[in-house]
């Protein structure tokens, strides 16, 4: 029930004055009563007594004590009621004046639909609102409430969308935590393999050096033993010669021939033979380069990897990111880069210039596509699954195997081309010439050309489609073939 506009709620002035503290002249806050009967705020009387030697009542100066303070619950309740009524009176005054036209002081009973303003009856005749559509406040409020209900419904739907998006980010955060733990393990495994390779190579080189050292030490020991024996023989001969020189002349000369033959047969010392030192160059010469070249022979490299973040729910990418298999649909974390309408995925690299080539092992797969797709500038917002038609008009260039009336055959993504009459390849080679605008496909086993696209490709990524197996056997993988790595050595400069 509305109040009369002439009635203003609120306490009387005399009643309000009775509820004011005699110290701060504000309504009581935590009112207390002294023994003399006067009332004050607890904080006010306490501050007064802080500067007094002996506490007294601030009004009548009667002697008082902090122990005499008694909380006045009745007075506190009256103050609370006073403040509540004052607040209600302020709200009522604001409400009453907000419903009155400031210009004509009339009741706001109309609404101008053009200016979106509340009007009184006098405002309707104002030239500013001449010819405008005006209707009663009640009807306008009914119409606007209906619109607000529609807006409320739209906001609720938007809130649901926000919650759904939040759940997507929660799923992404959980996925990233699991993926990070798995990635950390895989990275450590790969570096452990490299460290193990280097450890084995280091030990092999150290063992070879130790063996050479041992062999040359044995040879040196043998030579030193021989020289020691020869030295002892010579010492014995010197001693014998000294004894003969002390004999009389006849005896000395009688042994001259035999002595000469004996001394002539003594051996001459051999010079130090070459190759006795450890071959330092054999072990330290270009050591890192030689180990690196040996490492290349044991490391498998591919021109690019499969990007698991683009793989549709049907596809499972191997741990080394070089093969993919269609195991049937499984729910994956939602992200805009992922294909959702077909079992497709992309390669990890983006090509926009230069020459590039890669080979794909297809084996006996019965449904596949291999080619490239133009990188969409808005793919971060919409993903790659915006179109169900993966053909040249949508920026897809590929060769695929499909099932026809007369059996399986190969076709291209260009609807205007006829089926390729050559046998279905088991290993496909793709060559991309960005500057020339050529994308060529070859049967890598038969070394024959299949088809060449001519177009302005722009930025493209390798594109793959892998259909499900038609039979009951286990699904076959599609693999990226490893590169043959060779090192060309040239003089610097």
From Swiss-Prot:
Tell me what reaction this enzyme catalyses.
S-ubiquitinyl-[E2 ubiquitin-conjugating enzyme]-L-cysteine + [acceptor protein]-L-lysine = [E2 ubiquitin-conjugating enzyme]-L-cysteine + N(6)-ubiquitinyl-[acceptor protein]-L-lysine
Entry binding sites for Zn(2+)? 101, 104, 123, 129
Keyword Lipid metabolism annotated: no
Q: Does the keyword Methyltransferase apply?
A: no
**Keywords tagged on the record:** Acetylation, Apoptosis, Coiled coil, Cytoplasm, Metal-binding, Nucleus, Phosphoprotein, Transferase, Ubl conjugation pathway, Zinc, Zinc-finger
Pfam families, A to Z: PRY, SPRY, zf-B_box, zf-RING_UBOX
N-acetylmethionine (modified residue): where? Answer: 1
Q: What induces or represses this gene?
A: By TLR7 and TLR9 stimulation.
Q: In which pathway does it act?
A: Protein modification; protein ubiquitination
Q: What is the E.C. number?
A: 2.3.2.27
Family of the protein in this entry: Belongs to the TRIM/RBCC family.
Its biological purpose: E3 ubiquitin-protein ligase that participates in multiple biological processes including cell death, glucose metabolism, and in particular, the innate immune response. Mediates 'Lys-63'-linked polyubiquitination of TRAF3 thereby promoting type I interferon production via RIG-I signaling pathway. Can also catalyze 'Lys-48'-linked polyubiquitination and proteasomal degradation of viral proteins such as influenza virus PB2. Acts as a negative feedback regulator of TLR7- and TLR9-triggered signaling.
Q: What is this protein's record name?
A: E3 ubiquitin-protein ligase TRIM35
**What organism does this protein naturally occur in?**
Homo sapiens (Human)
Q: Which gene encodes it?
A: TRIM35
